[in-house]
UniProtKB/Swiss-Prot annotation:
Positions of 3',5'-cyclic AMP binding: 491-492, 494, 501-502, 542, 545
Reaction(s) this enzyme catalyzes, per UniProt: K(+)(in) = K(+)(out); Na(+)(in) = Na(+)(out)
Reported regulation of activity: Inhibited by Cs(1+) and ivabradine. Unlike HCN2 and HCN4, HCN3 is insensitive to cyclic nucleotides, such as cAMP or cGMP. This lack of sensitivity of HCN3, despite harboring a functional cyclic nucleotide-binding domain (CNBD), may be explained by its shorter C-terminal sequence, which may alter the normal autoinhibition of the channel. Phosphatidylinositol-4,5-bisphosphate (PIP(2)) shifts HCN3 activation to more depolarized potentials and accelerated activation kinetics.
Glycosylation site list: 290
GO biological process: cellular response to cAMP; cellular response to dopamine; potassium ion transmembrane transport; regulation of membrane depolarization; regulation of membrane potential; sodium ion transmembrane transport
Family recorded in the similarity comment: Belongs to the potassium channel HCN family.
Annotated function: Hyperpolarization-activated ion channel that are permeable to sodium and potassium ions, with an about 3:1 preference for potassium ions. Contributes to the native pacemaker currents in heart (If) and in neurons (Ih). In particular, plays a pivotal role in maintaining excitability and promoting rhythmic burst firing within hypothalamic nuclei. Exerts a significant influence on the configuration of the cardiac action potential waveform. Does not appear to play a prominent role in the processing of acute, neuropathic, or inflammatory pain.
Protein name, UniProt field: Potassium/sodium hyperpolarization-activated cyclic nucleotide-gated channel 3
Extracellular side: 118-123, 192-200, 274-296, 319-328
The organism of origin for this protein: Rattus norvegicus
Alphabetically ordered keywords of this record: cAMP, cAMP-binding, Cell membrane, Glycoprotein, Ion channel, Ion transport, Ligand-gated ion channel, Membrane, Nucleotide-binding, Phosphoprotein, Potassium, Potassium channel, Potassium transport, Sodium, Sodium channel, Sodium transport, Transmembrane, Transmembrane helix, Transport, Voltage-gated channel
Primary residence: membrane
Amino acid sequence: MEEEARPAVGDGEAATPARETPPAAPAQARAASGGVPESAPEPKRRQLGTLLQPTVNKFSLRVFGSHKAVEIEQERVKSAGAWIIHPYSDFRFYWDLIMLLLMVGNLIVLPVGITFFKEENSPPWIVFNVLSDTFFLLDLVLNFRTGIVVEEGAEILLAPRAIRTRYLRTWFLVDLISSIPVDYIFLVVELEPRLDAEVYKTARALRIVRFTKILSLLRLLRLSRLIRYMHQWEEIFHMTYDLASAVVRIFNLIGMMLLLCHWDGCLQFLVPMLQDFPSDCWVSMNRMVNHSWGRQYSHALFKAMSHMLCIGYGQQAPVGMPDVWLTMLSMIVGATCYAMFIGHATALIQSLDSSRRQYQEKYKQVEQYMSFHKLPADTRQRIHEYYEHRYQGKMFDEESILGELSEPLREEIINFTCRGLVAHMPLFAHADPSFVTAVLTKLRFEVFQPGDLVVREGSVGRKMYFIQHGLLSVLARGARDTRLTDGSYFGEICLLTRGRRTASVRADTYCRLYSLSVDHFNAVLEEFPMMRRAFETVAMDRLRRIGKKNSILQRKRSEPSPGSSSGGVMEQHLVQHDRDMARGIRGLAPGTGARLSGKPVLWEPLVHAPLQAAAVTSNVAIALTHQRGPLPLSPDSPATLLARSARRSAGSPASPLVPVRAGPLLARGPWASTSRLPAPPARTLHASLSRTGRSQVSLLGPPPGGGGRRLGPRGRPLSASQPSLPQRATGDGSPRRKGSGSERLPPSGLLAKPPGTVQPSRSSVPEPVTPRGPQISANM
């Protein structure tokens, strides 16, 4: 800057020291000082310049979009001229707040003073009017230097000429008339004592014009500016948006109604006063002309509220024509305000819980649909219960909401909502976080009722399921059901082999599941080929241990792996983890159940099922062969199977090892869980697998001194969560045991000794019967 300024100086001044800076251009000086004249001291100029510019805060970032845009707007203010005020600056915010409070005071005080006060030259009244007129005049001047927000084009006018032109064309005339300092004129020339009645009435008319100023300020502030105030206060006090907006709207409605009643009450007394209280007006008829202003205001307010609420005429019906017209005007304004208040209040109440309102509207349509098709009562009840458990009284368009969000925010929400599912599944714990996120973003939430078939035997597998909450049973022909509960998954082998379901899966309780379609499953595994290899490796290992083979999986495993050496390590880790969990079922001592945690097991196969159910899911495949522990049946409750010892879940990354603590738990319903029931002396059920697929069942008698009750077909439970003994185990043609009365033994079976228990005596237990077919070792 100095190099450019030196040629303009004379030759005699060329030796001026460099520290003496030549005077800068006016525009450059204003830009350096933030739009403040150079005559002000440097610290004050910078401080004032900062107050006149928009600051970087949440509101400015929402308006302009970025820090860079805010800086550009600040540069616009600096280059616009001296004392140009940005409409979003801190100075304008505090000034508008002061004007808002002063405006509310004028809205309340001025009507009362103009209507009821006769002595208008008292010091308090003069001070109030002088301060009000001063602030209104200052606001009139500042409006010429404040940028104007053009709502049509979302543009902010900062050029002085553009601001002046637009303000002169809009609200300048109204502001000028309403800002005439009448009290200044009375104080300076002292004309008020010498004014006649007509001039005095003219002065009152000028005071009434002050309402135009107040209304113009309301329109200048704009509703958006009021919302901006409340948003900034909300951020300061850390209030939630819904609560803050609801409270503000309620206060706005109540305040507007009270303010209109206040104005109407003052108007009811002002009109008779301007007519010098004629004999047919309500003030003269009630002899209230010389009463105190408080009494007059109270009666006027009561009369106005009676009209506005349409509940009567007050103390008496109107007689004179002015009172009649005032009454009609009050009724019209009151009816309009009442309708607006009811409408806003209704909309406010509905907006407070819009999701529940949408649910109620949707369920009304469902009820009409059920009535139109004349559905039976039990079906209607199931539909009602489904909606209650699926939506829980609130309905959201979740796909639309998540689709409008950014991808990182959508992934964060999905990870948070599915955190319980991820925490219960070691498959996700051992997998890449990107794989977990890719799977979770493609899951679909589903709800099933007790008795619903989630998977039907013989159908083509198009989905796999992850269990968030609930209890399900795997059913196959001629086989006992196997339990699935929180944290388990099933159906992945059919997606890998594109085969058919070999068993059905039934919901025993209300189940909240997440499904993954075959297309999404393959898309995720194509993106993460190492996880496909891991799925296939674990599936083949499980099928191999139960003597099953799958040509499709073998062919895929023979193909070269596209992954690195770390993928093979992960596969070995998953397979080893799977085998360790399977061996943990056999290695658990019978007496350790009481010392372990009471958390229910994730897999609880009650009996060994035939080999045909092995491929239903990779988790079931292990559960079918590694359950060696006996399952006692309580003599006091034939319908309940009791856990004699803690059993580990089947080895699977999807079913983690969770110990069980034996404890008393009564079966309170058809779906009562049996994973934490005690083990009283009773018969125990054991089944072994044969290559022919037949379940060979035998019963072990209770220890000496134990009692027993008859196990008949009528005592079997109806619930799938409490399966019973087969009828051939308690047939009428089976031999009875000595001394047991009504107890019966199966016609044939294999007697097995539970691990860690004492073998009953030969007098109480018959010799084991050799099965017809060869047995598969459980240690496979």
